[in-house]
Regions:
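Arginine/glycine-rich "motif VI" loop of SF2 helicases in the C-terminal RecA-like domain
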Residues: 36-40, 97-100
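NTP-dependent small-molecule kinase module
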Residues: 87-146
Length: 146
């Protein structure tokens, strides 16, 4: 999830909703909705790709120094880096408030893209295999499943 500050500022949130508990209430709503989905049989997998500050800086520099990657870079990226600690606290709070049995978070080290892809793929494969096993019907007249 990436929140663009400039987009967030344009949101038309009714003033009556913007109170001291706006984020706590929203996180609770998210957790309740995801629990509802889980009880309905929907598999909810959430991944937080945890890139270190140093790795993020390397990637930003590569985007600046590689013309075909310039489109990925925004000046707001430089400005937002000063709030790294605030973002980490917000992520920690959001993950803690919305991690449930029905909708777990996978906090994945993401400095090495190959490792990140491996971990995410493995979690998805495991969920799909669970679904296949859950909905597999027994073959007629045979003890084993198809």
């Amino acid at each position: 999830m990436r929140v663009h500050e400039e987009i967030l500022k344009q949101q038309k949130i009714p003033k009556s909703l913007v109170g001291k508990r706006i984020w706590e209430d929203r996180l609770a709503d998210i957790a309740h909705f995801e629990d509802y989905l889980g009880r309905q049989g929907v598999i909810v997998l959430k991944f937080f790709l945890n890139v270190s500050r140093e790795q993020q800086k390397k990637r930003f520099m590569k985007r600046l120094n590689t013309p075909e990657k310039n489109w990925k870079f925004s000046a707001s990226d430089v400005h937002e880096r000063q709030f790294w600690g605030d973002y980490m606290l917000a992520y920690e709070e959001a993950i803690g408030a919305t991690a449930t049995k029905h909708a777990p978070w996978f906090v994945v080290p993401a400095n090495n893209k190959w490792f990140t892809r491996l971990v995410v793929s493995a979690a998805i494969v495991e969920a799909v295999e669970w679904l296949i096993d859950r909905f597999r019907l027994p073959c007629a007249g045979v003890v084993r499943t198809c």
